[in-house]
Amino acid sequence: KAPAGGYPFYETEAKYDNIILLSNNGLQGAGKIDFIHSTSQTLPSSLFAFLPDSTVGIVDFVNRPHEQAVEFPPVKSDEAYISYVPKEDVLRVRSLPTKELEFFDGESNLRGGIEIRPEGMRGKGLMDLSRATLISDDFSFKRWDIDADTASFDLKNENPADNEEDPLVFNTDNVTAHVSFKDRLGEFNSNQGESKVNFPVNQYYCLMDKFKWYMDNAEIDMERASGKDITIDQGVDLKGPNFYSTHPKQDSLQFMAPKARFNVRKKVIYCDEVEYIDIADARISPDSMKVVIRKRAKIDKFQNATILANYITKYHKFDQAEVEIKARRDYKASGRYPY
């Protein structure tokens, strides 16, 4: 049994105040380790193992939230693996295959590990945010926030129509991430100018610079700020497309939309500021500059649209047109032809 005041711990100021057992399994003991704002308590069926440079064990782990100076989030697990390295001033905590680390009072769970130091808490792995997942090799945690310089972000399909519908409705990689559980907002920026965003259920992908995820509204705003005008030989100024259909029957239908909003529950993409879509030899301009994309790449009909045919010579112009776009070279329309 430890003397009053405890045993010196690895030649540091830390003390161990409990029973130490010496056997063929080495030095072992039961009790708890208090480190910064965390407590690691051995389970009834487990013991700490005292190694030459560290203490390891399966514990009931709690990290209490702290909002002043260096911030720490609330984390807990009733069964986690810890490694305490006093001379490095670090406590490492890792989830078990059957037990994730619970963050932010149940708002998210981490399948991976964290490091607690006086400078703060970092980690890596997969964060399950209930409706979304965030994957990174280097998370930084604060009282209410998750940050990552490089991350992948997915939004789950919460209400699939059938077993064949994709389990994800939104996916992007290589973005910076800032998620605030206080503001109920996630903000993401591309690390490479533009990031590819996949919409598996809509059978589309787009290229965008930045995104904002409104957690409670289940919506995400997207913006493309880096699009440049491209001049082709015929002298027509075109903006490079950033929305592309992946539907096998639409022949890579594509168009430019610098802004869009995605409704996660409805699985609908609302594209804004769409000047035109080139279909076959026609240039079709929606009067609202809006394009609505539903599941399986279905585009809502345009009302009161303008059609130029062909779009190089602009010889024929139709207005007040109702247009149904079916594929890159296939559309059906009716309208007025002034002459």
Task: Label the predicted regions.
Residues 1-339:
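Structural signature for solvent-exposed beta-strand/loop edge elements and short helix-capping sites
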